[in-house]
A protein has these predicted regions:
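Canonical Radical SAM [4Fe-4S] cluster-binding loop centered on the CxxxCxxC motif
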Residues: 1-33, 44-45
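Cysteine-cluster motifs in flexible loop/terminal segments that predominantly coordinate metals
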Residues: 17, 285-334
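Radical SAM/AdoMet-radical enzyme domain recognition
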Residues: 35-53, 60-188
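C-terminal accessory region of radical SAM enzymes
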Residues: 190-225, 251-307
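Short, small/polar residue-rich loop motifs at catalytic or cofactor-binding pockets
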Residues: 233-241
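Long, charge-rich, low-complexity alpha-helical segments
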Residues: 297, 370-451
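Hydrophobic packing positions characteristic
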Residues: 327-355
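Short alpha-helical segments that sit at the start of domains
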Residues: 352-380
């Protein structure tokens, strides 16, 4: 499920906005997605749920027509991510929808502190909140500083009968230093107190709290706070996966924070799942970069439970050390040769079924489905050579006996590395990325040693 960015127009100027690279301004012109292109994207992303985003999606001149098209599809559901300052046309349209249609639209109202609105904007927001079925609405807000007064969120939920709240931790636009409002080393702990207090207060009022973007790492909380928070459903999350934003021209990016470094185009992919997997694989390379010194030896990082905070902070941390750092060596032959491959034995299994047969397969996230990979001698030799200490270029030299010449060795070994990477079985160590060696069971280690 992707976010369809139907417009880059927005009628607010939020202090924590991370969409500044695409938002229309004096240098970037308005881009309202044409209806024909909107329909094409719906074919590319044919999920049962479609997310409409911006900018502010309701500023699109064809917004209501887009809703009508989606509602005409049997079984289609819609999420609208909005600031709620709707025009009278949009408000009347939504208020007038029959229940059979309105129940298929969910609204996430991202709201600011009351003193950040003009009187007109505030009246529009309250009118929008009053126009929707509270059961289909979330109130969302972003914590971008501390101390942070969230009492207005609880009051707004009470006033409009909305029971579900989503919170985010502000994430910077990596090219806009004005958005660097949070320093992980200094601010994560204080922000964790804000999150904890908010969740406890909301829970006491019977509200459902859902985490959104910008998760904090477990180490930001005290053990006592974590114990309390783990009892609150749906609970905390310490990592994220690609949702994928798709805009005009088929331009797609993993998320707004990573807009400038992780982009693609829908024309190069078979569908939304293919595109999402492309981004998710490369996400792991960013997650391997340490934000804090403590991350290097962290068991939560080892297990994949925690990324250490928003991935944009990983990028910033790397650029502070090397402005020319290559984040995705898997896509660059020269960088790949210099990297150190690490196998992920939570995903990859090497099973010596018998003295004459070794089976190599992958199974992700405790799924029932497996995929069998190659088990020829050179592939098994490559797996054994990936010891987390040896660079790719040295592995190629060590496996030279299997090939006719160095060019063939280089091409084949890099192809094997990319095969394992595409199956979520390979991490790449670099000067700034330190994927930890996964713990192996005795049987797995024994199988690895006998290769």
């Amino acid at each position: 499920m992707g976010n369809v960015i139907i417009t880059n127009s927005c009628n607010l100027n939020c202090p924590f906005c991370f969409a500044t690279e695409t938002k229309c301004n004096d240098e970037i012109k308005f881009q309202h997605m044409p209806l024909d292109e909107f329909r094409s994207i719906l074919k590319f992303d044919h999920n049962v749920v479609t997310n409409l985003c911006g900018g502010e999606p309701t500023t699109h001149p064809k917004f209501t027509e887009m809703l009508e098209e989606l509602l005409s599809v049997r079984g289609k559901y819609i999420n609208v991510l909005t600031n709620g300052t709707w025009s009278e046309k949009v408000r009347k349209y939504i208020a007038g929808l029959p229940f059979e249609k309105s129940k298929r639209i969910v609204y996430l109202f991202n709201v600011l502190q009351p003193d950040m609105y003009t009187e007109k904007q505030k009246n529009r927001l309250y009118a929008a909140l009053d126009a929707v079925n509270p059961e289909t609405a979330f109130i969302g807000f972003t914590i971008y500083k501390y101390p942070f007064d969230y009492s207005y969120i609880l009051e707004m939920a009470r006033t409009f009968g909305i029971r579900r709240i989503r919170y985010s931790i502000a994430a910077p636009n990596i090219h806009d230093s004005a958005a660097f409002q949070i320093d992980p080393a200094q601010d994560f702990r204080e922000l964790a107190d804000v999150v904890y207090d908010f969740i406890m207060d909301a829970r006491a009022l019977g509200l459902e709290v859902n985490p959104d973007c910008g998760s904090l790492p477990p180490c930001a909380y005290t053990p006592e706070q974590l114990a309390d928070l783990m009892l609150v459903k749906p609970g905390l999350k310490f990592n994220c996966s690609a949702v994928v934003d798709i805009a005009q021209g088929g331009e797609a990016w993993r998320c707004y924070s990573l807009y400038s470094i992780m982009k693609a185009n829908t024309k190069d992919f078979s569908g939304i799942q293919d595109l999402t997997e492309y981004f998710n694989r490369r996400t792991r390379l960013l997650a391997d970069i340490d934000i804090l010194d403590e991350c290097r030896e962290c068991e939560h990082k080892r297990s994949g439970l925690c990324y250490g905070g928003c991935l944009s902070y990983h990028v910033i941390a790397a650029w502070k050390k090397d402005r020319n750092y290559s984040f995705f060596p898997i896509d660059n032959d020269v960088e790949l040769l210099s990297s150190i491959p690490h196998l992920d034995y939570k995903v990859l299994t090497v099973w010596e079924k018998s003295p004459d047969e070794t089976i190599v397969y992958v199974r992700r996230d405790q799924q029932l489905q497996t995929k069998t990979l190659r088990n020829d001698p050179v592939f098994l030799a490559f797996i054994k050579a990936c010891d987390g200490k040896t660079a790719m270029k040295n592995i190629i030299e060590n496996l030279a006996e299997y090939f006719n010449n160095s060019e063939e060795a280089t091409a084949e070994v890099m192809a094997m590395a990319r095969l394992l990477f595409d199956q979520y079985s390979l991490h790449l160590g670099t000067a700034l990325a330190s994927p930890l060696q996964q713990h192996m069971s005795p049987k797995r280690r024994e199988a690895h040693e006998v290769l």
